[in-house]
């Protein structure tokens, strides 16, 4: 005879639903989704201001090397991309008056003592340099940084130069037999800039017909 009043067998400990692997996975997925959405919203919020700042910086840089009197168009809107065997793809900002190209501006990179040196240069239709500026570099402060217009006027010495002025042998620093000054204690840096600007002139010369082709009329 069974005793109906006997206690039921003991049960295992109650399982907390929060510790379930399925719930943990769902919570982790939800957290990741919320984080991704927040990052996307933050990216969208900053993309506009960053793009606007980049456009302002570009216009300011162009204004330093490209006289406003040479164009009635917006060079940042009239862009040609060169495909060059030596330099690769080069983005070119075209200045024009009445559709006739008066000058082009582009950026090339050279390598100095501290690393990459980004140089922006404007070249007139006749092949003479209108101006050049160093956009960024990591050269030694107090020595190589004289390539900056804010530190020295050395970079302004390229205005008016061309492939024939001073000629192939002259496109070097004085220590190498050329006409351009080097800096005391720093020869590698100016040598790199001179070489980069000379490369820019030869690039222009190779693609002269393409670069100086009239702009299509605006609709």
From Swiss-Prot:
Q: Which of UniProt's keywords are assigned here?
A: Electron transport, Flavoprotein, FMN, Membrane, Nitrogen fixation, Phosphoprotein, Translocase, Transmembrane, Transmembrane helix, Transport
Subcellular location as annotated: Cellular chromatophore membrane
Specify the enzyme's EC class, one word. translocase
State the GO CC annotations: plasma membrane; plasma membrane-derived chromatophore membrane
Q: Molecular function terms in GO for this entry?
A: electron transfer activity; FMN binding
Q: What is its EC number?
A: 7.-.-.-
Check the record and name the InterPro entries matching this protein.
Answer: FMN-bd, Ion_transpt_RnfG/RsxG
Q: Name one GO biological process term.
A: electron transport chain
- Could you tell me the superkingdom of the organism this chain comes from? Bacteria
Transmembrane segment boundaries: 25-45
Against PANTHER family, the record matches this protein to: ION-TRANSLOCATING OXIDOREDUCTASE COMPLEX SUBUNIT G
- Quaternary context: The complex is composed of six subunits: RnfA, RnfB, RnfC, RnfD, RnfE and RnfG.
Its family? Answer: Belongs to the RnfG family.
What is the protein's given name?
Ion-translocating oxidoreductase complex subunit G
């Amino acid at each position: 005879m069974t005793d109906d009043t006997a206690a039921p067998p003991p049960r295992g400990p109650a399982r907390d639903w929060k510790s379930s692997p399925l719930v943990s996975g769902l919570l982790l997925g939800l957290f990741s989704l919320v984080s991704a959405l927040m990052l996307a919203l933050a990216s969208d919020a900053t993309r506009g201001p960053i793009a606007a700042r980049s456009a302002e910086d570009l216009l300011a840089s162009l204004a330093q090397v490209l006289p406003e009197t040479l164009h009635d168009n917006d060079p940042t809107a009239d862009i040609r991309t060169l495909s060059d065997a030596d330099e690769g793809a080069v983005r070119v900002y075209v200045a024009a008056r009445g559709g006739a190209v008066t000058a082009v501006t582009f950026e090339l990179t050279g390598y100095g003592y501290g690393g990459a040196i980004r140089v922006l240069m404007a070249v007139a239709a006749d092949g003479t340099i209108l101006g050049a500026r160093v956009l960024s570099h990591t050269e030694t402060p107090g020595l190589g940084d004289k390539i900056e217009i804010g530190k020295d006027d050395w970079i302004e010495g390229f205005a008016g130069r061309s492939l024939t002025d001073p000629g192939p042998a002259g496109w070097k620093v004085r220590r190498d037999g050329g006409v351009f000054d080097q800096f005391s204690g720093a020869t590698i840096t100016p040598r790199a800039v001179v070489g980069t600007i000379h490369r820019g002139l030869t690039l222009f010369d190779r693609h002269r017909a393409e670069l100086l082709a009239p702009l299509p009329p605006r609709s």
